């Protein structure tokens, strides 16, 4: 039997000025579900990073859309952020994901590439699917003891 859930879908233009709408919507949904304040703040950062990556990288000069789906389950919130823009070499980027050497001065940290590390750190699970565009599925559990620790929290799927 399939697990029951409610779904909220949104589409916004892939422009920076619309990211706050998604962040505020997610915060309202998470608050209604009973998430703790700190978890809501973590999810706000994660969804902002995912959307900002699309705004900056997916469509280059073209105008595109960001599709967002919230899956409201009894014990978790799943957030899917997707675009149909230009995909990139995810495996190459994944190999460069933090943690970063704290002995290096801040000036030597890369300007890009922290978003995926932040999302991975702040969410309980993250899956990234890439083929045409990019889809990021982020999960946050209401009760953290339900999180599995398999040592590889980022997984990737390629469409065939």
Curated annotation (Swiss-Prot):
PANTHER family named among the record's database cross-references: ANTI-SIGMA-F FACTOR RSBW-RELATED, SERINE-PROTEIN KINASE RSBW
Keyword Membrane belongs to the record: no
Pfam families: HATPase_c_2 (PF13581)
GO MF annotation: an example: sigma factor antagonist activity
Similarity comment: family membership: Belongs to the anti-sigma-factor family.
UniProt xrefs under Gene3D superfamilies: Histidine kinase-like ATPase, C-terminal domain
Reactions accelerated catalytically: L-seryl-[protein] + ATP = O-phospho-L-seryl-[protein] + ADP + H(+); L-threonyl-[protein] + ATP = O-phospho-L-threonyl-[protein] + ADP + H(+)
Enzyme class, broadest EC rank: transferase
InterPro entries per record: Anti-sigma-factor_SerPK, HATPase_C_sf, RsbW
Species in which this protein is naturally found: Bacillus anthracis
Keywords for this protein: ATP-binding, Kinase, Nucleotide-binding, Serine/threonine-protein kinase, Transferase
Known role: Negative regulator of sigma-B activity. Phosphorylates and inactivates its specific antagonist protein, RsbV. Upon phosphorylation of RsbV, RsbW is released and binds to sigma-B, thereby blocking its ability to form an RNA polymerase holoenzyme (E-sigma-B).
Protein name (Swiss-Prot/TrEMBL): Serine-protein kinase RsbW
EC number(s) recorded for this UniProt protein: 2.7.11.1
